[in-house]
């Protein structure tokens, strides 16, 4: 018998009342929607495994693994668009803007997942990368009826964040036709924010209407229409690229090391020490002592050990510059080209 109190169960979200206006010529007429869905590659029947329910467990595992192999190829085909999106996001964040993901269902959850990982991984403010889902926080665990059909809700959610022209808004939708997402991007564009549309179908309204369209076409799902599968995987991989490469470009890493991670538990404190050891070739005791002198900031500890400057000066240099450890090390070397420093290679 469970020992969890009944109050621990998540509340059941309330249905969203009434259909809202639909953008981009889409309609709420069911016959028309069926016709639209029939044109989407993600809604087609996967002819490789039409007898899914007749396969053994081992065969199902092999079939699913085989089907997933198309995802990296789909993403490789849109690498130029992903790079363009990253550059646009970096430019906005350097201006003091934010990165906002939004979507419905799986797409919304993928954005929230990626956004939630940024603070512990890169030491960012929780408000820098934000994830929105149609229907609000309750929809993370349970679907909210009709929410994705409301383009006005997408607009309202962005308005609640006081979106500005300095922000980057990424709409995520496997079909590329979700009204909630289209309405949000229409509003974002109207105020000058850069808009990026991530879809898993070619020729989607989302990619067409966004400033930058990314169409990772993964094809029919193993389970017909279940876009939490390949489409969801593709969305997660692309969002990984958008956030991670953006953080690299913003100087939140040193080589391929996490130097702005938040040390909020023992595992992360051990990782911080190991990161300092990898970057500077010092022992664990030295790494721990140096980290303590800079309040656990990995980036500052490495700067102290590489350059030999005092802890407070290292912190001041990083906070006074653009935050790039490589740039801070290079600047110190330019000031004191004959100064000896530990071999960090």
List the model feature ranges, each with a label.
Residues 2-3, 23-74, 78:
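Cofactor-/ligand-binding subdomain signature composed of acidic, glycine-rich
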Residues 3-30, 343:
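Intrinsic disorder/low-complexity segments
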Residues 42, 63-71, 131-142, 254, ...:
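Gly-rich Lys/Arg/Thr-decorated short loops/hinges at beta-loop-alpha junctions or inter-strand turns
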Residues 246-345:
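Short, amphipathic alpha-helical interaction segments embedded in low-complexity terminal/linker regions
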């Amino acid at each position: 018998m469970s020992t969890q109190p009944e109050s621990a169960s998540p509340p059941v979200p309330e249905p969203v009342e009434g259909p809202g206006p639909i953008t981009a010529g889409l309609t709420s007429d069911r016959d028309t929607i069926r016709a639209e869905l029939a044109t989407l590659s993600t809604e087609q029947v996967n002819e490789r495994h039409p007898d899914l329910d007749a396969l053994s467990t081992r065969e199902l595992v092999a079939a699913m693994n085989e089907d997933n192999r198309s995802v990296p190829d789909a993403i490789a085909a849109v690498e130029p668009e992903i790079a363009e999106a990253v550059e646009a996001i970096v430019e906005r964040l350097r201006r003091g803007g934010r990165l906002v993901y939004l979507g419905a269902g799986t797409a919304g959850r993928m954005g929230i997942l990626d956004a939630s990982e940024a603070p512990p991984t890169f030491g960012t403010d929780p408000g820098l990368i934000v994830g929105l889902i149609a229907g609000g926080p309750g929809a993370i665990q349970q679907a909210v009826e009709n929410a994705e059909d409301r383009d006005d809700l997408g607009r309202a959610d962005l308005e609640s964040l006081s979106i500005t022209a300095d922000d980057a808004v990424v709409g995520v939708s496997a079909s590329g036709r979700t009204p909630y997402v289209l309405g949000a991007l229409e509003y974002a564009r109207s105020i000058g924010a850069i808009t990026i549309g991530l879809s898993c179908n070619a020729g989607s309204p989302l990619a067409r209407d966004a400033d930058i369209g990314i169409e990772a076409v993964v094809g029919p799902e193993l389970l017909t229409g279940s876009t939490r599968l390949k489409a969801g995987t593709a969305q997660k991989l692309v969002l990984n690229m958008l956030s991670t490469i953006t953080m690299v470009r913003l100087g939140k890493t040193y080589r391929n090391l996490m130097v702005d991670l938040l040390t909020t538990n023992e595992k992360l404190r051990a990782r911080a020490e190991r990161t300092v050891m990898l970057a500077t070739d010092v022992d664990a005791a030295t790494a721990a002592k140096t980290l303590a002198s800079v309040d656990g900031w990995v980036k500052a500890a490495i700067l102290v050990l590489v350059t030999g400057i005092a802890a407070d000066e290292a912190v001041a240099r990083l906070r006074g510059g653009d935050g790039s450890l490589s740039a801070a090390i290079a600047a110190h070397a330019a000031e004191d080209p004959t100064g000896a420093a530990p071999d960090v290679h």
